[in-house]
């Protein structure tokens, strides 16, 4: 009966939504806040009265985001730090510094992502390892540092941005897909541990979004576009923010992405690969690195453009 009650409650929660919680004076750490979705999320948090802590790599910085938020809130309510989140020592020092200068972090947004696009054979072991450090282990290190203070007060919220590579493996993105799939398991495991420990005041949210109209994806041209065009930053950020504010554990933007695990579950594996080949893989990569400006370079120094393949050869 308890399971039925929870299912009904979840369905009602999904259909009718609930009142958004008040996050004024919450200390929110956002990684990858210098641009893109991280910047947009930081602005939305600031508009709701949160104390926003910005974190990005030294080569990107937070100057633009800091300026935008300072025009919304008092400068004392926004703080900017630089950190290589792929470095465990730097992450540890960052959290200690924030706790000393700002206060205990009550909301963590794991948003930073380092994209690498190469086939698994063309990617070096060092590149693969660096990608996992930045995209997977950074979230683990941050949660390990921040979660104890949340548990002492039974209050907090951990948010992780996943992207579409968390729900299906995409060719030439093996490092990112590995990291994002790992984050799914990490978030589910943490949520279970919190439930077992009786920490009902600490929430988790995992957000999956379609690719966005940012510098990384502005040249994207896949067969998905007529059905699901690239999302604007404003639209994606507002949808994810609403899910956070009603404590939703998992959110997909757009909702069509909820169907992907179901489709993968009922279709033969080769059939799902044919769908991927038809809509994504054969002709054009998700983004074209060599056409981006130098300041937007990714971790991988070269862009691997997959050759056109037949459906059968790709599946065998």
Language model features with spans:
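The beta1-alpha1 cofactor-binding region of Rossmann-like NAD(H)/NADP(H)-dependent oxidoreductases
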Residues: 59-60, 81-93, 125
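Canonical Rossmann dinucleotide-binding motif of NAD(H)/NADP(H)-dependent dehydrogenases/reductases
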Residues: 13-53
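Substrate-binding pocket helix/loop in short-chain dehydrogenase/reductase
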Residues: 119-120, 127-129
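Conserved glycine-rich Rossmann-like NAD(P)H-binding loop of the short-chain dehydrogenase/reductase
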Residues: 48-64
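SDR active-site lid
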Residues: 193-257
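Active-site helix of classical SDR
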Residues: 143, 179
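Non-catalytic terminal and boundary segments that flank Rossmann-like NAD(P)-dependent oxidoreductase
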Residues: 1-25, 274-316
């Amino acid at each position: 009966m308890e399971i039925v009650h929870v299912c009904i409650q979840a369905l009602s929660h999904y259909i009718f939504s609930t009142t958004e919680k008040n996050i004024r004076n919450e200390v929110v750490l956002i990684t990858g806040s210098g641009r893109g979705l991280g910047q947009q999320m930081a602005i939305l948090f600031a508009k709701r009265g949160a104390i926003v802590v910005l974190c990005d790599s030294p080569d990107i910085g937070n100057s633009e985001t800091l300026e935008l938020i300072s025009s919304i809130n008092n400068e004392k309510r926004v703080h900017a730090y630089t950190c290589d989140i792929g470095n465990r020592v730097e992450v540890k020092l960052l959290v200690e510094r924030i706790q000393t200068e700002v206060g205990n972090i009550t909301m963590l947004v794991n948003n930073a992502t380092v994209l690498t696009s190469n086939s698994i054979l063309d990617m070096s072991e060092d590149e693969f390892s660096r990608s996992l450090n930045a995209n997977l282990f950074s979230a683990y290190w941050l949660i390990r540092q921040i979660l104890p203070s949340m548990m002492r007060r039974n209050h907090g919220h951990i948010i992780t941005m996943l992207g579409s590579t968390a729900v299906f493996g995409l060719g030439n993105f093996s490092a990112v897909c590995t990291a994002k799939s790992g984050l799914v398991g990490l978030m589910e495991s943490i949520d279970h541990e919190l439930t077992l420990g009786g920490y009902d005041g600490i929430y988790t949210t995992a957000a999956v979004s379609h690719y966005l109209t940012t510098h990384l994806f502005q040249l994207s041209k896949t067969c998905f576009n007529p059905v699901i065009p690239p999302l604007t930053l404003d639209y994606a950020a507002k949808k994810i923010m609403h899910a956070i504010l009603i404590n939703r554990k998992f959110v997909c933007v757009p909702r069509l992405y909820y169907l992907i695990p179901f489709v993968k579950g009922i279709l033969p594996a080769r059939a799902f690969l044919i769908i991927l080949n038809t809509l994504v893989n054969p002709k054009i990569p998700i983004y074209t690195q060599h056409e981006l400006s130098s300041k937007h370079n990714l971790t991988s120094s070269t862009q691997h453009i997959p050759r056109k393949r037949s459906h059968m050869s790709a599946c065998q």
